[in-house]
């Protein structure tokens, strides 16, 4: 059944064609309920998606488009903005290749341009492979950096969302040594503000922001490092002067337990793994038979952009690409969160 044009048009970039991106796109849009809440269009390659449909055994047809507004937006049919940019012989399944990296970058570029021009309401990105992107000549540390560069923003941050936990990172794809150097008052203050605004957009009117320390025990009064005293505490004080309920610095080994206990609505982490490790520890689902991690549910949101962008919180998983085993839960959650954020923007709220 076709859905009305008042539903948000959501672009879903296919990700690296050699990874699990095509499969999780197909599995997500095989769910008829998606068409009750949005008008989804995949930005990708029709030939790759046909291969994914055959792999999953889904009873779906493809509708290649040259204009996203021409989609039928009907359950059972996948509308795809077909860039036709993949040679299946060059971009093999489960392998790093410059050809696949180039294609993945082009999906993101097209999706950003369309969303910026208001041809779409939001962009949801499938997983890319950083090595493949760089081999193709696009020298970025990750998806977030690509988006920031294409859009031309300098102040942005990554937020992960999963099962009531929300974490915003002071830095992401840099070495740990450099991440320590990026713990500066102005940057931490900016990230606290982005976290505050994001929480409000998620429906939390007066969010409590738990700000993690950088060092063990949040520095223990300067015994284990002075970044808390010199940079983080002044940033928290400045945020509080703006009316933001920022608390900290909280020892990094307890801040997430406190957030799970509802003491904080959002955590500001000082670097990539400080935020990612706890989120992925609770975010992975375990196989009931083997006890091994099999799927992750979390969603990545980019803050500081003029458009809504969400993403899966996992990689290309080359080791299972082409097997039909990929779990699409993170992609499904990313689409639903994008729909929610678009709805709030339409209601007059500022989306970050």
Describe the role of every protein-language-model region.
Residues 135-157:
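Glycine/threonine-rich beta-strand-loop-alpha-helix active-site module
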Residues 68-69, 148, 156-159, 200-201:
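A generic local secondary-structure boundary/capping motif
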Residues 160-182, 186-190:
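Ligand-binding beta-strand-loop-alpha-helix segment within the catalytic cores
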Residues 1-143, 186-210, 214-270, 274-300, ...:
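Contiguous, glycine/small-aliphatic-enriched amphipathic segments in soluble metabolic enzymes
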Residues 150-165, 302-317:
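Short, flexible loop segments at boundaries between secondary-structure elements
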